Every structure is written in structure tokens, then in C-alpha cells.
Amino acid sequence: MMMNPRGFGIKRFKRSINNDSLTKFINDNRNIESSTVFQGNLYEYTVMRELESKLNVINMMKIGGSNDGGIDLVGDWPLRTIYEKMNLILKLDGNKIPSISKINGRTIKPIYNSILKGNLDTMDLKILVQCKAFSSSKVSPKELRELVGAYSTHCNRPSDKNKTIVMMCSPNLLTSKGLELINSVKIPLIYLRVSLIKNLNKEYDIENSGKLLNYYENSYTSELLQNLGVKEWLKLGLYNADLNSRNNVK
């Protein structure tokens, strides 16, 4: 059953505070809005907004270009904020999980156990993001394999493997083969379904479209991030919440 976030003294904020970059890009590039370059960049800005506002990703930068290695965006993901707010609600620090997991032959140490030992730095992750602004087609296994290759290029040291998560963003759902593939890879990968910004009567509806619709962690990521409350954070819509104090909890 989905919990009612209103029971935790939540204050709602308008989504428009994250629309500045989108609005500026659209206004500055009206003369090329029919081009694929415009549509691709618009989608990247849309993804940036959704990651910043809903997953608390910070320091986001566009790096797309001829030498991007298949990566369009990079950023920092400080999971501590999400964990601490979800811990107020779900009492996550009372749970016990295995110290080591194995997925596809790779040994994984869940971040949560490091938190219990006082190592809070393990919650500061890097993200690499690839955006596919497909209007109708779905991300293919070939494109997902290329993303895995891009991850390996950017994270070529063993110490980087559990500190960096790669994200694929597209407006459409994964195919069954795509889903099978991402769960078989030996890297932390998240698939995000983010819709396109709608153009209504020559005006872009940045307020009501371009939303994060689905969030899917592959098997590796689920083990790495287990008991940090990320899925629950999204399910309850707490990215719009003010839970800065235990006094807010009722």
C-alpha cells in the first residue's frame, strides 16, 4: 500500500523552480526548433531537470559532443539526503542486509552497510547519463551494449565501479530483450523513462510534460542501493517534500 506523504508534515513546492534552463534554451533557439539537434538538446535539458528535481542529482553538466564517449550528461548523486529523509519515515537503520551480494559473478558490497559503520562518503556517487530522444522507437539491446562500453571507458579503474552509476534515459519503455540485457550486465545501470516536452500550439508545455515516468534499477544497482530508500522516495513523491526536521514527522 502506498503511504500518504501528507501524514508527515510535507510542504509542496512548485515544479517551475527547475524550468529556467529549459525556458532559456527554447527561447534562444526558436529558429532551429524543427531540427534534430534542437530536439536532442531539449530532451537533455528535460532529463537534467527531472534528475535534479526528483533524484536530487547535483552539479549536472552537458558534455555531449564528438568526444563524449557516448555520454551526454554527468553529475553527482549525494544519496545521503534521500536516505536520511526516508529513514525518518521507514526507520531504515533498523534493517539488516547481507554484507556481500553476488550478481552475474560480480561481488557487490551494499552501500547501506558502510553507512552503518559511519562511512557516509560511500553515498556520494557519480552518474553518467545517455539520452535517447526517440519519439516512437525503443532503446535497442545494441544501444544498451554501447552504453555499457561507454561506462567501461569512463570507469576503467576497479575503484570506480561501485562509485559510478550509468543511466539511460528515453521516452519509451524497454523491450523484453533490453530488460533482460541490462539485468545481465556487470555494472550498475538505471533505466529512466522520461517523456518528451509537448509542443502545443507552438508553445512548449514545460510544466505538464517532460516528466519522469518510470525508474528501473538493474539487478546490480538494486543490490548496491538496497535499503537506501530511493524507490520509496520516488513512489511517495517525496522529492516535493520538506522533511528537514524530525519535528515534521507526525
UniProtKB/Swiss-Prot annotation:
InterPro entries per the UniProt record, alphabetical: RRG7 (IPR018828), tRNA_endonuc-like_dom_sf (IPR011856)
Record has Transferase as a keyword: no
Signal sequence region: none
Location in or out of the cell: Mitochondrion
Chief localization: mitochondrion
GO molecular function, one term: nucleic acid binding
Matches recorded under Gene3D superfamilies: 3.40.1350.10
GO cellular component: mitochondrion
Keywords: Mitochondrion
Record-stated family: Belongs to the RRG7 family.
Designated name of the protein: Required for respiratory growth protein 7, mitochondrial
Biological classification of the source: Eukaryota, Fungi, Dikarya, Ascomycota, Saccharomycotina
Gene: RRG7
